Amino acid sequence: MLKRFLKRPVLGQIAWLLLFSFYIAVCLNIAFYKQVLQDLPLNSLRNVLVFISMPVVAFSVVNSVLTLASFIWLNRLLACVFILVGAAAQYFILTYGIIIDRSMIANMMDTTPAETFALMTPQMVLTLGLSGVLAAVIAFWVKIRPATPRLRSGLYRLASVLISILLVILVAAFFYKDYASLFRNNKQLIKALSPSNSIVASWSWYSHQRLANLPLVRIGEDAHRNPLMLKGDRKNLTILIVGETSRGDDFSLGGYPRDTNPRLAKDDVIYFPHTTSCGTATAISVPCMFSDMPRKHYDEELAHHQEGLLDIIQRAGINVLWNDNDGGCKGACDRVPHQNVTELNLPGQCIDGECYDEVLFHGLEDYIDHLKGDGVIVLHTIGSHGPTYYNRYPPQFKKFTPTCDTNEIQNCSQEQLINTYDNTVLYVDYIVDKAINLLKSHQDKFTTSLVYLSDHGESLGENGVYLHGLPYSIAPDTQKHVPMLIWLSKDYQQRYQVDQACLQKRASTLDYSQDNLFSTMLGLTGVQTTYYQAADDILQPCRRLSE
């Protein structure tokens, strides 16, 4: 009985190719067809026919590729790759509403083991195990009947390819205008079609990565300090906090009805409620905000082999330190002193390879005590990174309940998810306030200042979208609206003649973005270079300091 059950089923080669082409093109593209139905109402016979033609085209293309691969005995291997890739893509699209593009591949490649583990759920294991791994095993397990004679088999397969091509041509002849209009007006659709989405996105990512060995482009070689910043007994110390996945919409400083910023509300900070990000993923936003390029002209390839903000600040003679708790600086700190404090795995601060952001302060007191000269300290936080929002804050910050204490966020209610996320913001409030108090405790030696800016926002199930990383052109504002604030000590305001009331007024009425960080940090630290743009320096209109 067992022997009979384990006996390998046998299919002819054409039947095998047709079966697995259908599975890949139709069964692993449910996410694609669901998205098509959102943009193509079936309110006419023509639209119904256009929709029906889509799986026909997908099947024809996959069948052509697998059949041609069969001539060089690669059909099984290629089918398995398509199945595994398609199953994974479909799961994440259906579960989190993501889009498979280059930035998503970059996110995946930058994902830490801890982040990968956080995504692992019973639903994910079961879904990928059945639709991906099991299907791939079956593709190898099914025995293909040897073709006799081979010439006839070859002719049959060529005929299959020709018929598939003919079907594509016929669909194009009848529905080209419909396809062109649909995909032109809904460019994100093609990024839901497997396995082409993963193939194109991976190739695009590789094309960018291979440029990493290009020679370094130096900028700001004329960098020097404003002489007025060097006068006086006190040195200058600035902390720049790079936030992670914090939404401007959830900061009470910006009008959010919940009190998510109780500490910062007492710190006399300048909050900028109308701030947008450069990208919707850390891999894009962090290199962009530390570059001299505005978002509209940002060149990701150039940014990977060009100096940035911290290189210029360091060249001007300021001590720079980057403390990281978010999986790396994406190139922004490559040429300045930096350390991954997550790897310290401090007791009480770290769980399963991830740490609370308070770990970023480990050793900072000692570093500041021994700091000779001016300094800039960058704290790269893990902030509100999902989907394990409940792991971002210690138990005492669980203020808003009930919470979503699972990584299967799609199974939580909207109330639970927002409560959990808002608790992460409450902890962000604590971290930024702690940094301000750290600076205050060293005001006997330093004139101090602080900037906080999140890298991007987050979707919390609005319109069925979760997490972040959607293409900028179609991403919701929740992924692009980010919190930014500046704190200036009284000493800084007086010493460098900055009118805080002026800043508060401008902050509440004007629009800002991550484009402002580069020149604002140069101005804040008194670094002069031809790359500095006064129009982008937030403090400049309210500053009376001059040579």
From Swiss-Prot:
Pfam name, any one: EptA_B_N
Predominant subcellular localization, coarse grouping: membrane
Recorded metabolic or biological pathway in which this protein acts: Bacterial outer membrane biogenesis; LPS lipid A biosynthesis
EC number: 2.7.-.-
CDD domains with a match to the protein in the record: LptA
Record's note on what induces expression: The eptA-basRS operon is positively autoregulated by BasR under high iron or aluminum concentration conditions.
Domain of life: Bacteria
Residue spans crossing the bilayer: 10-30, 48-68, 80-100, 124-144, 155-175
Matches recorded under Gene3D superfamilies: Alkaline Phosphatase, subunit A (3.40.720.10)
GO biological process: lipid A biosynthetic process; lipopolysaccharide core region biosynthetic process; response to antibiotic
InterPro entries referenced in this protein's UniProt entry, alphabetically: Alkaline_phosphatase_core_sf, EptA-like_N, PEA_transferase, Sulfatase_N
Entry annotated with the keyword Thylakoid: no
Membrane topology label: Multi-pass membrane protein
Top EC class of this enzyme: transferase
Subcellular location: Cell inner membrane
GO cellular component: plasma membrane
PANTHER family: INNER MEMBRANE PROTEIN, PHOSPHOETHANOLAMINE TRANSFERASE EPTA
Function: Catalyzes the addition of a phosphoethanolamine moiety to the lipid A. The phosphoethanolamine modification is required for resistance to polymyxin.
Protein name, entry field: Phosphoethanolamine transferase EptA
Name of the gene encoding the protein in the UniProt record: eptA
